[in-house]
From Swiss-Prot:
Compartments where found: Mitochondrion inner membrane
Biological process per Gene Ontology, one example term: ubiquinone biosynthetic process
Classification of source organism: Eukaryota, Metazoa, Ecdysozoa, Arthropoda, Hexapoda
Other noteworthy facts: This protein may be expected to contain an N-terminal transit peptide but none has been predicted.
Protein name per Swiss-Prot or TrEMBL: Ubiquinone biosynthesis protein COQ4 homolog, mitochondrial
Organism this protein belongs to: Drosophila sechellia (Fruit fly)
Length: 268
């Protein structure tokens, strides 16, 4: 842990053995150690990211948390909150990714989930009990699109930036495997599962403060059914970030849930 803290204190380019002026070209000085090559995602992210000071990070974290609390529909503030408060959790997630073969493949490939990268016409041809077919049905039933996620801008390390990007783009896949809709009750339940599974502070915040805005009837159902179910699944489920979802389209969704330790809530 001490090594990680020391590493975070160094500028990103220096951690990779690069001078700041040479990030885009990946030129390495003769004095610096051999740098780990930047992949396409990392190069693009370093061009577009917004550098902020520790004070600015603290200010943005506090301001975005207040704004998100006052208006949970401010997705820009929720995104900012996730980036300014989630660095420690993301390092832990990175360790989890590197501990599994599937997670290592994700970090090497850095797949993206967009309408331009996923063959949705193919997914529509899959049997209805497959994960891919369930994902398409979820998108249609809830009228959502994978293209709506905000880009990551404030994280220093591009690997952590990819993990935050991955978390955002996989959110609807988590909804799918949990069989939860995108209404407030479903979102709060999913946030609890994500919080316990990833440790991201913004997920805990969304779970706690989102529940405050539930209507009385929703709150009764939440306390009696949804919350116990979400807490149980959040604690029991295997780590979800290292799951290479795009390689699971043809898998039977019931078998996938069983593999991950996930049960579906009986909403009747």
């Amino acid at each position: 842990m001490m090594q990680r803290c020391l590493r975070l204190q160094k500028p990103l380019a220096l951690r990779r053995g690069l001078h700041l002026a040479q990030v885009n070209s990946q030129a390495v000085t003769t004095e610096a150690p051999e740098a780990e090559p930047l992949d396409a995602f990392e190069r693009q992210y370093l061009k577009e990211r917004i550098e902020i000071s520790p004070f600015q990070r603290l200010f943005l974290g506090a301001g975005s948390s207040i704004a998100a609390l006052l208006n949970p529909r401010r997705h820009d503030m929720i995104a900012c909150l996730g980036e300014t408060t989630g660095e420690d959790a993301l390092w832990t997630i990175l360790d989890t990714m590197q501990a599994s073969e599937e997670g290592q493949r994700i970090m090497a490939d850095k797949p993206r989930i967009h309408t331009s990268t996923i063959d949705f016409k193919y997914l529509e041809t899959l049997p209805p009990d497959t994960f891919g077919a369930a994902y398409v049905k979820f998108l249609k039933d809830n009228q959502v699109t994978p293209d709506s996620r905000m880009a990551v801008r404030f994280l220093e390390d591009p690997k952590l930036a990819y993990l935050m990007t991955r978390y955002r783009e996989c959110h609807d896949l988590i909804h799918t495997v949990l069989d939860m809709p995108t209404n407030m009750l479903g979102e709060v339940a999913v946030k609890w599962v994500e919080a316990l599974n990833t440790g991201l502070p913004m997920c805990y915040g969304g779970a706690v403060f989102g529940a405050v805005r539930l209507r009385p009837k929703q709150r009764r159902a939440y306390l009696k059914h949804y919350l116990p179910w979400a807490l149980e699944n959040g604690k029991r489920a295997k780590p979800l970030m290292p799951v290479y979802w795009e390689k699971r389209w043809e898998q039977n969704i019931h078998e996938l849930r069983s593999e991950l330790g996930i049960t579906v809530l009986n909403k009747a």
